[in-house]
Amino acid sequence: MAARLCCQLDSARDVLLLRPFGPQSSGPPFPRPAAGSAASSTSSPSPSDESDLPLGRLPACFASASGPCCLVFTCADLRTMDSTVNFVSWHAKRQLGMPSKDLWTPYIKDQLLTKWEEGSIDPRLSIFVLGGCRHKCMRLL
């Protein structure tokens, strides 16, 4: 499993802060990718590049029609890390009204990230921890 990252949206500077989760939680902020940016190849980054991954680099399974694999995202309030939950399961329970899984990708790209930016998402996810999976990384469109 990949290293875990603490992600925090800094709306004052319009950046997403990606920091290693652990005793040393410092790291440079990465700007969010511009809408409509070109997709890159799906090759896996080298270990030396992993600390400089932009926000748009997500596992390829993130945008699959069936949703991300169960190892991709684990979310938790940092105050209660002993009770982490799988993001996919947590989100599915909140979105029981969605007609099909075909809407997963547009929902994540448009609605979820917009809600996060506007600050109207559940406070439990305002700070969350990402895990990794075996899938190669890709850049969001």
Curated annotation (Swiss-Prot):
The coiled-coil regions, if any, are none
A Pfam entry, by short name: X
Task: Give the main localization category.
Answer: host cell
Q: What InterPro entries does the database record attribute to this sequence?
A: Transactivation_prot_X (IPR000236)
Q: Where in the cell is it found?
A: Host cytoplasm; Host nucleus; Host mitochondrion
Give the source species: Woodchuck hepatitis B virus (isolate 59) (WHV)
Q: Which GO terms describe its cellular component?
A: host cell mitochondrion; host cell nucleus
Signal sequence, start to end:
none
Q: Which family does it belong to?
A: Belongs to the orthohepadnavirus protein X family.
Q: How does it assemble?
A: May form homodimer. May interact with host CEBPA, CFLAR, CREB1, DDB1, E4F1, HBXIP, HSPD1/HSP60, NFKBIA, POLR2E and SMAD4. Interacts with host SMC5-SMC6 complex and induces its degradation. Interacts with host TRPC4AP; leading to prevent ubiquitination of TRPC4AP. Interacts with host PLSCR1; this interaction promotes ubiquitination and degradation of HBx and impairs HBx-mediated cell proliferation.
Compositionally biased intervals (Low complexity): 33-48
Which gene is the coding source of this polypeptide chain? X
The protein's UniProt keywords, in alphabetical order, are: Activation of host NF-kappa-B by virus, Activator, Apoptosis, Host cytoplasm, Host G2/M cell cycle arrest by virus, Host mitochondrion, Host nucleus, Host-virus interaction, Modulation of host cell cycle by virus, Transcription, Transcription regulation
In UniProt terms, what function does this protein have? Multifunctional protein that plays a role in silencing host antiviral defenses and promoting viral transcription. Does not seem to be essential for HBV infection. May be directly involved in development of cirrhosis and liver cancer (hepatocellular carcinoma). Most of cytosolic activities involve modulation of cytosolic calcium. The effect on apoptosis is controversial depending on the cell types in which the studies have been conducted. May induce apoptosis by localizing in mitochondria and causing loss of mitochondrial membrane potential.
What's the protein here called?
Protein X
One biological process term from GO is:
symbiont-mediated arrest of host cell cycle during G2/M transition
Q: Where is this region: Mitochondrial targeting sequence?
A: 68-113
PTM remark: A fraction may be phosphorylated in insect cells and HepG2 cells, a human hepatoblastoma cell line. Phosphorylated in vitro by host protein kinase C or mitogen-activated protein kinase. N-acetylated in insect cells.
